[in-house]
């Protein structure tokens, strides 16, 4: 089969984002929710060649803040849609119709028979292929489309070409500025936390038995003080 028989070269991308901002009390206190979503299809060329079909990515953020602090959290998730690896699609599609061992056996037998009958190499090859590929579904036929659907939805790369991904990232940040409470310096403390949840069902990561999760945590503090040495020179120390 030609690659054009096995895939769709159309590319598309749809994106949207929105936000809700609420200030219930003072102008410096705000609650906000921001969402982003995108979906698309294309051909991707890397170490292998992929048909990215119906891939989607979304992110949602909730944040509470004022002039002295903020607390915010994100969740980012993706879905692979009906994506498949084009490198293995052709061979596995043919193997699903007729296993490679049977095909090569029929080919070799027909080639040898044609050669013994006086055919040239090109003639023997044509006759052998015609014998081995008798009944092969034609591209676009109902039988071909059934095979294509079965192989692209099969995530075992020995027999199929599809892969799945439904990974997520959870992230949170918090920061407080003691500027209104301490006058001799500007003091800030904060933290950052992130959890990765890899979930490719064994098609990308080694997670066939279940999602892989791992986390990161960071803490920080900052002290800053300014010294006005004269009207045109100021010294800032940060630690």
Please identify what each model-predicted range represents.
Residues 61-239:
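Face-selective signature of the C-terminal outer-membrane beta-barrel domain
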Residues 4-6, 45-46, 160-162, 209:
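Short secondary-structure boundary micro-motifs
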Residues 1-39, 60:
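Transmembrane beta-barrel wall of Gram-negative outer-membrane proteins
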Residues 13-15, 27, 34-42, 72-81, ...:
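Structural signature of outer-membrane beta-barrel domains
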Residues 35-39, 45-48, 233-239:
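Transmembrane beta-strand segments that form the barrel wall of outer-membrane beta-barrel proteins
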Residues 56-58:
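Extended, low-complexity, charge-balanced
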């Amino acid at each position: 089969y030609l690659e054009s028989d096995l895939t769709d070269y159309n590319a598309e991308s749809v994106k949207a984002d929105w936000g809700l901002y609420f200030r219930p009390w003072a102008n410096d206190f705000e609650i906000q929710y921001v969402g982003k979503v995108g979906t698309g299809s294309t051909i991707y060329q890397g170490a292998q060649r992929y048909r990215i079909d119906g891939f989607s990515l979304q992110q949602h953020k909730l944040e509470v803040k004022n002039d002295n602090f903020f607390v915010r959290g994100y969740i980012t998730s993706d879905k692979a849609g009906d994506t498949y690896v084009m490198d293995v699609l052709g061979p596995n599609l043919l193997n699903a119709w007729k296993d490679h061992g049977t095909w090569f056996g029929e080919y070799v037998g027909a080639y040898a028979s044609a050669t013994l009958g006086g055919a040239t190499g090109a003639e023997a090859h044509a006759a052998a292929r015609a014998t081995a590929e008798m009944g092969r579904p034609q591209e676009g036929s109902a039988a071909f489309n059934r095979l294509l659907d079965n192989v692209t939805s099969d995530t075992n790369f020995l027999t199929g070409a599809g892969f799945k991904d439904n990974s997520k990232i959870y992230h949170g940040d918090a920061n407080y500025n003691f500027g209104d409470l301490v006058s001799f310096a500007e003091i800030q403390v904060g933290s950052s936390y992130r959890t990765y949840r890899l979930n490719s069902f064994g098609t990308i990561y080694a997670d066939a038995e279940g999602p892989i999760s791992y986390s990161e945590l960071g803490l920080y503090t900052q002290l800053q003080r300014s010294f006005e040495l004269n009207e045109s020179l100021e010294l800032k120390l940060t630690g």
